[in-house]
Amino acid sequence: MTYNLHPAILVLKDGKFYRGWTLINSIISFGEVVFNTGMTGYQEIMTDPSYAEQIITFTYPEIGNTGINHEDNESNKIHVKGIITKNICFSPNNWRQQESFINYIFNNQIPHIFGIDTRALTKHLRKTGSMNGCISSQYLNPYLLSTKFKDRLSIESSDLVKQVTTSKNYEFQGYSHKHFSYLQYKTDKMYGYGLKIILIDFGVKYNILSRLDNYGCSIQILPATSSYETINAYNPDGIILSNGPGDPSIITYAIKTVKKIIKYTNIPIFGICMGHQIISLALEGTTFKLKFGHRGLNHPAGMKQKAEVTSQNHGFAVNQESLYKDTINITHFNLNDTTVAGILHNKKPIFSVQYHPEASPGPHDSDYLFKYFINLIKHFKQYKNYKNSSLAQAR
């Protein structure tokens, strides 16, 4: 298939603009412009619900080299508002490839622009912070496009979770296709067999479900708006609070629900990314917006002399000073900027991390946390009490 190139423009809210090319004529798309430093994983990133309402700048200069397959999607649709690249590979080659990247973006009409200086753009975003922007091939006048930002809501004032959460309760039955995972061949399917896990869906990635399924857990997925009474009626052995997009402080309904779960039950809880922030807010902590966020596959997280290389994708973080030391232990810091990356409750079986142990894309250093969660559930079911233990001991 042959494609025509059309001139396109990226305009930022501060007036900065970049000209490039697109394969789609007459597009216009608004979103928060952010950058991801990963060399791979573009398919997982575009289908990750945590990227809702965002335009992603890929800092790696060549995107699309390994094509697209039908197994690596992290949800059932594309969530990004657009993508920005230096170059797009027109001749990909990979043994798992089922479609070229250019076919994928053209067939799905994904707003995009390429041929711009992504290094200069990334340096600008690092200096000024993430901001709203627009990709357009419909209008090419930057001053005209600048006037269209007035009615655009910021990430901080939008409840993005309600856009991506499931609309109904359902039980995870595995995938109709084979969801590829290197780790599925190294997991004991009987290790968590029979355990009832409730997952609160703030924008869950498929691989979180896949990792739990690989351990043999029974997984019930509930909407983010589920009440304490609804969750408790399932009598779960454990609860996972998933990843998700946007500002966690806006998700007041979930914060209130988690606060009740913590107060009235001793159910083990594991929070991932947005789930980590929701737990912190339920424990009277606060969050703040990062200048340009953490989005990449090689963020070091740890404490003292031991660190994990982690996959991260968030624009908000927990304020360390807001956490009560008599209630919460900080287990991990982001070693790039010392923001809180993991916490452990002192008196209840609750822990959370500000990164993605399921990877997809990214390293597997923190995959042990799923097994730790299962061990926590087993311990509580057997002894009916919680003995505080270091996360490091679970490796």
From Swiss-Prot:
Binding-site positions, L-glutamine: 50, 244, 246, 274, 277, 313, 315-316
Reactions performed catalytically: hydrogencarbonate + L-glutamine + 2 ATP + H2O = carbamoyl phosphate + L-glutamate + 2 ADP + phosphate + 2 H(+)
GO biological process: 'de novo' pyrimidine nucleobase biosynthetic process; 'de novo' UMP biosynthetic process; glutamine metabolic process; L-arginine biosynthetic process
Keywords on record: Amino-acid biosynthesis, Arginine biosynthesis, ATP-binding, Chloroplast, Glutamine amidotransferase, Ligase, Nucleotide-binding, Plastid, Pyrimidine biosynthesis
Location, primary (coarse class): plastid
Annotated ranges, domain Glutamine amidotransferase type-1: 196-383
Region CPSase, residue ranges: 1-192
Residues in the signal sequence: none
Enzyme Commission number(s) from the entry: 6.3.5.5
A GO-annotated cellular component: chloroplast
Broad enzyme group: ligase
Subunit field text: Composed of two chains; the small (or glutamine) chain promotes the hydrolysis of glutamine to ammonia, which is used by the large (or ammonia) chain to synthesize carbamoyl phosphate. Tetramer of heterodimers (alpha,beta)4.
NCBIfam families in alphabetical order: CPSaseIIsmall, PRK12838.1
The protein's name in its UniProt record: Carbamoyl phosphate synthase small chain
Organism encoding this protein: Gracilaria tenuistipitata var. liui
Lineage: Eukaryota, Rhodophyta, Florideophyceae, Rhodymeniophycidae, Gracilariales
